[in-house]
Swiss-Prot record:
Lineage: Bacteria, Pseudomonadati, Pseudomonadota, Gammaproteobacteria, Enterobacterales
Ranges of residues in domain RNB: 189-516
Protein family membership: Belongs to the RNR ribonuclease family. RNase II subfamily.
Name assigned to this protein: Exoribonuclease 2
Places the protein is found: Cytoplasm
SMART domains listed in its UniProt record: CSP (SM00357), RNB (SM00955)
Length: 644
C-alpha cells in the first residue's frame, strides 16, 4: 500500500533536503578514525566504522549527525576518488591477492587481481601498477582494484627508480629510432671548424649541448660565439622522433642515470659536440661591451664547428684558482679559458647591477654502487667554471628572446611575473613590519621587483626573503614574449639545450626561419602545456627517487649521536622541516621534539617562527644541529631531533 505513495516520497524528499550535509576531503589518521575537512577552519569527525567506506583523500558529500552536541560525518556520496591509478606492493599469493598502495596515509590492503592480458604471475612483495574498479560509495560492497602492469620484484635493487617512473607514468628507457642522414634545410652553414671552440661540462657528461669561443675586439669589447648542438638538422618536424621528443618534452635526470628525450645515438653522439669531431651547430655571435652590455649587433647563423677540447668544470676552476695539477692542453685553449672568464665576470657584474643574480646553492650528487646502493652524497658548489657556462648561456638566451620577439613576435619563452597582484597588499604589510616600505604598484613592475630583491639580498639573513616567497607567482612557459622577474630580464627564451628540452628544439626551428627570412607558424598552446606538465612530473620523480635514496643513506644513522647541520626551511603547526646542509636531505622535526609542554609552544607558519614561553627560539633559515631520530623506510621519511 506504501509503494509509489506520492506523500511518502514527498516526506522522504523533505527529510533528505532538511538533513545537513557537507562536502569535503577525507583525512585519515593512524588510529582508524578520520576527519572530513570542509575548509581550513571546519572539519567533522568520521568514526572508524564509517571510515571503512572511504579512503584518505576522497572528496565526498557526507550527512552530518549531531548527538549530545557532538557532530560526526556519515559518508554518502563520492565526488572524486583519491585513488584511480596507483602503484603498490602485492600481499598474498595464488587467487587471494591484495595490494597496499605506496602512500604514507594508505595502510589498508585492497583486494585485487590481474587485468586481462597481464601475463605476470603476481607474488608477495611484487611491485605493480593498479587501477581502482570498485568503491563502497558507488554501491559496491568493498574496495577492489585491477593490476594493470608488473613493475618489478621485491628484491630488485633499482626499485626506487622503476616504482617512481611507473607512479608518474614516465618512460624508463631511451627512445628507439635512428636518424640516418641530415635533412636538407636550405641553410648555408659557415665553416668555423678552425676556431678554438671548447665545451665545459661535468667530467661524465656525454650529451654536450654547447661550445664556446671568445675573442678580443679592442676598446675593452669581447666577442662571444655560442655554438649549440643541432638536433633539428636530423629530426624533421612531425616525424616519429619529433613526436616522441614532443611527448617526453625533457631529458629526465634522476639520481644515478638519465632517460633521454632523444635516442642516445643522437643525444650522446651525432648531435653531441664531441672534441675533435665535426658537427653541425646553430650559432649566435654577440658583442659584449666593456661594462658587460650585450650590443645590438646580435647574429644567428647555421655553422659547422669542431670542438677543440672537452673540459671539465673542476679542472677549469682549479686552474683558474691556481690549484690542482691540471693544465690546458695548449696555449690556445688557455687563452680561451681566460677570455671566457673575463666575459663571465663582466656579464655577472652587468646582471648584478641591471638584472638579478641567483644566490649560489650547491648541487648534490648521489654516488651509487653497482646495485644502486648510495656510497656517498657530495655537495658540489657552483664554481667559476660553472658560472662561465651559466653566464654564456644566459647571454645567448637573452639574444634569442630579443631576436624572436623583434622578428617573429613569438617563441617559447620562460615567463615569470614576480608577485601575484592579489598578494601585493599582504606583501607590503609584511615588509612594513620589518622596516621595508614598498609601493604596491611599484613592486609589481620589473624595476620595482628588482629593487626589492636587491634590498632583500642586502639583509643580514635570508629570513625575510623566505617569508615573501609564498607571495610569488610561478614561472610559466609561454609562446608570448614576457618578462622574467626572477632573472630580472625583459624577456628570456632558451635555445641552448635542444638535446634535452623540446622547447629549445622549437626555438631552433623558429630561429632557422628567421635566418632564412621565412614565415613560420606560432607554436601551439598544447605543446607548452605538455612541457609544463612534464617538467612538473620529472621534478616529482627526481624528488621521489631522492627521498628513497636519502632514506637508504641515512638509515644507519637513526638513533645514533651523529650530528648534522640543518637549515630550517619551513615551520608548520606540527613541527619544522629542515634541509641537511652537507647532503641536501629533507627531514622533519615533530613539535614534541622542540618542547615537551605543548601549551608553551607556538609553531607559526605565518611568522616562520617557533616560540617557547613567548620567546622566539627558532626561525626559518636558522641553521641548527640535529641528530637522526628515525628513518621510516616504508614512507621514505626522515625524522630528526634538535641537539639540546
Amino acid at each position: 500500500m506504501f509503494q509509489d505513495n506520492p506523500l511518502l516520497a514527498q516526506l522522504k524528499q523533505q527529510l533528505h533536503s532538511q538533513t545537513p550535509r557537507a562536502e569535503g576531503v577525507v583525512k585519515a589518521t593512524e588510529k582508524g578514525f578520520g576527519f572530513l575537512e570542509v575548509d581550513a577552519q571546519k572539519s567533522y569527525f568520521i568514526p572508524p566504522p564509517q571510515m571503512k567506506k572511504v579512503m584518505h583523500g576522497d572528496r565526498i558529500v557526507a550527512v552530518i549527525h549531531t548527538e549530545k552536541e557532538r557532530e560526526s560525518a556519515e559518508p554518502e556520496e563520492l565526488i572524486e576518488p583519491f585513488l584511480t591509478r596507483f602503484v603498490g606492493k602485492i600481499q598474498g599469493k595464488n587467487d587471494r591477492l591484495s595490494i597496499v598502495p605506496d602512500h604514507p596515509l594508505l595502510k589498508d590492503a585492497i583486494p585485487c587481481r590481474a587485468a586481462r592480458g597481464v601475463e605476470h604471475e603476481f607474488k608477495e612483495g611484487d611491485w605493480a601498477v593498479a587501477e581502482m574498479r570498485r568503491h563502497p560509495l558507488k554501491g559496491d560492497r568493498s574496495f577492489y582494484a585491477e593490476l594493470t602492469q608488473f613493475i618489478t620484484f621485491a628484491d630488485d635493487h633499482f626499485v626506487p627508480w622503476w616504482v617512481t617512473l611507473a607512479r608518474h607514468n614516465l618512460e624508463k628507457e631511451a627512445p628507439n629510432g635512428a636518424a640516418t642522414e641530415m635533412l636538407d634545410e636550405g641553410l648555408v652553414r659557415q665553416d668555423l671548424t678552425e676556431l678554438d671552440f671548447v665545451t665545459i661540462d661535468s667530467a661524465s657528461t656525454e650529451d654536450m649541448d654547447d661550445a664556446l669561443y671568445a675573442q678580443e675586439l679592442g676598446e675593452g669589447k669581447l666577442q662571444l660565439t655560442v655554438a649549440i648542438a643541432d638536433p633539428t638538422a636530423w629530426i624533421a618536424e612531425g616525424s616519429k622522433l619529433d613526436n616522441i621528443a614532443k611527448i617526453r618534452a625533457f631529458t629526465n635526470y634522476l639520481p644515478g642515470f638519465n632517460i633521454p628525450m632523444l635516442p642516445r645515438e643522437l643525444s650522446d653522439d651525432l648531435c653531441s659536440l664531441r672534441a675533435q669531431e665535426v658537427r653541425p651547430a646553430l650559432a649566435c655571435r654577440m658583442t659584449i661591451a666593456a661594462d658587460g652590455t650585450i650590443e645590438d649587433d646580435i647574429t644567428f647563423f647555421a655553422a659547422t664547428i669542431k670542438s677543440k677540447a672537452k673540459l671539465a668544470y673542476d679542472n677549469v676552476s682549479d686552474w683558474l684558482e691556481n690549484t690542482g695539477s691540471w693544465q690546458p692542453e695548449s696555449d690556445a685553449i688557455a687563452q680561451q679559458i681566460r677570455l671566457l672568464q673575463r666575459i663571465c665576470l663582466s656579464r655577472g657584474e652587468w646582471r648584478h647591477n641591471h638584472a638579478l643574480v641567483f644566490k649560489d646553492r650547491p648541487d648534490y650528487r648521489f654516488i651509487l654502487g653497482e646495485k644502486g646502493e648510495v656510497l656517498d652524497i657530495v655537495a658540489e658548489p657552483r664554481r667559476i667554471a660553472n658560472r662561465i657556462v651559466e653566464e654564456s648561456m644566459i647571454a645567448a638566451n637573452i639574444c634569442a628572446a630579443r631576436v624572436l620577439r623583434d622578428k617573429l613576435g613569438f617563441g617559447i619563452y620562460n615567463v615569470h611575473m614576480g608577485f601575484d597582484p592579489a598578494n601585493a597588499d599582504a606583501l607590503a604589510a609584511l615588509l612594513k613590519t620589518h622596516g621595508l616600505h614598498v609601493d604596491t604598484g611599484d613592486v609589481l613592475t620589473l624595476e620595482g621587483f628588482c629593487k626589492l630583491r636587491r634590498e632583500l639580498d642586502a639583509q643580514p639573513s635570508g629570513f625575510l626573503d623566505s617569508r615573501i616567497r609564498r607571495f610569488q607567482s610561478f614561472a610559466e612557459i609561454s609562446t608570448e614574449p614576457g618578462p622574467h622577474f626572477g632573472l630580472g630580464l625583459e624577456a628570456y627564451a632558451t635555445w641552448t639545450s635542444p638535446i634535452r628540452k623540446y622547447g629549445d628544439m622549437i626555438n631552433h626551428r623558429l630561429l632557422k626561419a628567421v635566418i632564412k627570412g621565412e614565415t613560420i607558424a606560432r607554436p601551439q598552446e598544447e605543446t607548452t602545456q605538455q612541457m609544463a606538465e612534464r617538467r612538473r612530473l620529472n621534478r616529482m620523480a627526481e624528488r621521489d627517487v631522492g627521498d628513497w635514496l636519502y632514506a637508504r643513506f641515512l638509515n644507519d644513522k637513526a638513533g645514533t649521536e651523529t650530528r648534522f647541520a640543518a637549515e630550517i626551511v619551513d615551520i608548520s603547526r606540527g613541527g619544522m622541516r629542515v634541509r641537511l646542509v652537507d647532503n641536501g636531505a629533507m627531514a622533519f622535526i615533530p613539535a614534541p621534539f622542540l618542547h615537551a609542554v605543548r601549551d608553551e609552544l607556538v609553531c607559526s607558519q605565518e611568522s616562520g617562527t617557533v616560540q617557547i614561553k613567548g620567546e622566539t627560539v627558532y626561525k626559518v633559515t636558522n641553521v641548527i644541529d640535529v641528530t637522526i631520530a628515525e628513518v621510516r623506510m616504508e614512507t621514505r621519511s626522515i625524522i630528526a631531533r634538535p641537539v639540546a
